[in-house]
From Swiss-Prot:
<comment type="similarity">
    <text>Belongs to the urease gamma subunit family.</text>
</comment>
<dbReference type="Pfam" id="PF00547">
    <property type="entry name" value="Urease_gamma"/>
</dbReference>
<dbReference type="GO" id="GO:0043419">
    <property type="term" value="P:urea catabolic process"/>
</dbReference>
<keyword id="KW-0963">Cytoplasm</keyword>
<dbReference type="InterPro" id="IPR002026">
    <property type="entry name" value="Urease_gamma/gamma-beta_su"/>
</dbReference>
<dbReference type="InterPro" id="IPR012010">
    <property type="entry name" value="Urease_gamma"/>
</dbReference>
<dbReference type="GO" id="GO:0009039">
    <property type="term" value="F:urease activity"/>
</dbReference>
<comment type="subunit">
    <text>Heterotrimer of UreA (gamma), UreB (beta) and UreC (alpha) subunits. Three heterotrimers associate to form the active enzyme.</text>
</comment>
<keyword id="KW-0378">Hydrolase</keyword>
<comment type="pathway">
    <text>Nitrogen metabolism; urea degradation; CO(2) and NH(3) from urea (urease route): step 1/1.</text>
</comment>
<dbReference type="InterPro" id="IPR050069">
    <property type="entry name" value="Urease_subunit"/>
</dbReference>
<dbReference type="GO" id="GO:0005737">
    <property type="term" value="C:cytoplasm"/>
</dbReference>
<dbReference type="GO" id="GO:0016151">
    <property type="term" value="F:nickel cation binding"/>
</dbReference>
<dbReference type="InterPro" id="IPR036463">
    <property type="entry name" value="Urease_gamma_sf"/>
</dbReference>
<protein>
    <recommendedName>
        <fullName>Urease subunit gamma</fullName>
        <ecNumber>3.5.1.5</ecNumber>
    </recommendedName>
</protein>
Length: 100
């Protein structure tokens, strides 16, 4: 199986996001890389489910709270940008201040 560099990057994001989700389910707080991966994965899956860019940008600010991440993480993540495949093509989704 051949994977392009972009596909390899997305596979790494998915792997990190699944680990982050397991940790969230156990009540652990996410660190910076885990939080970014988890948010990115939510965007990728939302696009796959047919949600619009604007819907994902609005919902993206409600997915994680300060209580779910380690101290200092919200201040480190001002925005998350991820290219996602939508029914009408690939688009860049930006989540501004995604941790509330």
């Amino acid at each position: 199986m051949y994977l392009s560099p972009q596909e390899k990057d997305k596979l790494l994001v998915v792997t990190a996001a699944l680990l982050a989700e397991r940790r969230l389910n156990r009540g652990l707080k996410l660190n910076h890389p885990e939080a970014v991966a988890w948010l990115s994965f939510q965007v990728l899956e939302g696009a796959r489910d047919g949600k619009s860019v604007s819907t994902l940008m609005n919902e993206g600010t409600t997915w994680l709270t300060k209580e779910q991440v380690m101290e200092g993480v919200p201040e480190l993540i001002h925005e998350v940008q991820i290219e996602a495949v939508f029914p009408d093509g690939t688009k860049l989704v930006t989540l501004h201040n995604p941790i509330s």
